[in-house]
From Swiss-Prot:
GO molecular function terms attached to this record: metal ion binding; protein serine/threonine phosphatase activity
Similarity comment text for this entry: Belongs to the PP2C family.
Record's protein name: Protein phosphatase 2C homolog 2
Pfam family, one: PP2C
Any one annotated GO CC term: nucleus
Residues engaged in binding Mn(2+) 1: 63-64
Primary location class: nucleus
Record-linked InterPro entries: PP2C (IPR015655), PP2C_BS (IPR000222), PPM-type-like_dom_sf (IPR036457), PPM-type_phosphatase-like_dom (IPR001932)
Length: 370
């Protein structure tokens, strides 16, 4: 978990933006940690409007560990590295994301200043193409979740060392798992950076003990899709995917801006003290992206409010819109037990999935949706 402060830093840094198709709010908070190691990006106009390619937007959350340098590098450079991949301009976006993650990792590895740096970061990103398709690339245990009519649908996998596919790669590369950690140290099994786990020159990047190679989930945006949530495990360790979707919905009904909903959720997750085994003591970052479906922002709020009022999908109780303060232990009590008993999944490293496949959706829900 790392060292904690005697009092949490509760100052929040928030921003928002939008166009006729999307609107986002994002916020981050240092919390109990001695430094802020998270980073994020929100790029509505990812590709030039004069480009021959369709319009794209890009969102990412990067949860650093062992320092903030890799997370900050990803915020500044990963989007452009992805966009520089030849496959991006050919419309092969899933390949561009995979090669872009590895290219960013390699660029850091070749940087002399970074070769001895112990830091690394997760990366959960959403590339939205032509307002119609989401390409979600993920490496690590940050998470991207879709809110569809009040139901949480996972668009990423949490890469934990005890997952069977991850464990097989780790041990094949000469690593081991102790107390649920890679070589007894790292609590996640994929990351950008963490070069001490990537030293076997006989293995390709995707076969190293820890790899930056992402899984990519492709989702065709549906008229029922309401919003997208990207967040670090500082949120997901405290709240399930479904709890967060319902919390966001309640904030929308209360006419709170998306960045204020982010701020309120972090207030809800922060631990009342630093003795909670790390739950609620981490840095926190959350980004909410609204799918306007051609509506104005006010009409989008009205649309979801009407759905909630007519009973279309679950929503947190009205009191949650005004609720402040820590409640992490009650909500998180069963999350770790749930992770400990997760069944192994059948997918291989760096696979691409179509989230509209019924079989895969069922598998996602069974495996990842708490």
């Amino acid at each position: 978990m790392g060292q904690t402060l005697s009092e949490p830093v509760l100052d929040k840094h928030s921003s928002s933006g939008g166009d006729r198709w999307l609107h986002f709010g994002v916020s981050h908070m240092q919390g109990w940690r001695i430094s802020m190691e998270d980073a994020h990006c929100a790029l509505l106009n990812f590709t030039d409007s004069n480009s021959s390619n369709p319009p794209t937007s890009f969102f990412g959350v990067f949860d650093g560990h062992g320092g903030d340098r890799v997370a900050k590098y990803c915020r500044q450079h990963l989007p452009d590295i992805i966009k520089s991949q030849p496959s991006f301009w050919k419309g092969n976006y899933d390949e561009a994301l995979k090669s872009g993650f590895l290219a960013a990792d390699n660029a850091l590895m070749q940087d002399r200043d970074m070769q001895e740096d112990p830091s690394g970061c997760t990366a959960t990103t959403a590339l939205i193409v032509d307002h119609q398709v989401i390409y979600c690339a993920n490496a690590g245990d940050s998470r991207t979740v879709l809110g569809r009519k009040g139901t949480a649908e996972p668009l990423s996998f949490d890469h934990k060392p005890n997952n069977d596919v991850e464990k097989a790669r780790i041990t094949a590369a000469g690593g081991f798992i102790d107390f649920g950690r890679v070589n007894g140290s790292l609590a996640l099994s994929r990351a950008i950076g963490d070069f001490e786990y990537k030293k076997d020159s006989s293995l390709p990047p995707e076969k190293q003990i820890v790899t930056a190679f992402p899984d990519v989930v492709i989702h065709n945006i549906d008229p029922d899709d309401e919003f997208l949530i990207l967040a670090c495990d500082g949120i997901w360790d405290c709240k399930s995917s479904q709890q967060v979707v319902e919390f966001v919905r309640r904030g929308i009904v209360a006419r709170q801006s998306l960045e204020v909903i982010c701020e309120n959720l972090m207030d809800r997750c922060i631990a009342s003290n630093s003795e909670s085994c790390g739950i609620g003591c981490d840095n926190m970052t959350i980004c909410i992206v609204a799918f306007l479906h051609g509506r104005g922002l006010e009409d989008w709020y009205n649309w979801i409010t009407q759905r909630v009022n007519s009973g279309e999908g679950p929503c947190a109780p009205p009191s949650y819109a005004e609720l402040r303060g820590p409640n992490t232990i009650a909500d998180a009590r069963n999350l770790q037990l749930e992770y400990d008993h997760i069944a192994s999944h059948e997918y291989g490293s760096g696979d691409t999935y179509d989230s509209d496949s019924d079989d895969e959706t069922i598998a996602y829900d069974r495996y990842y949706l708490h």
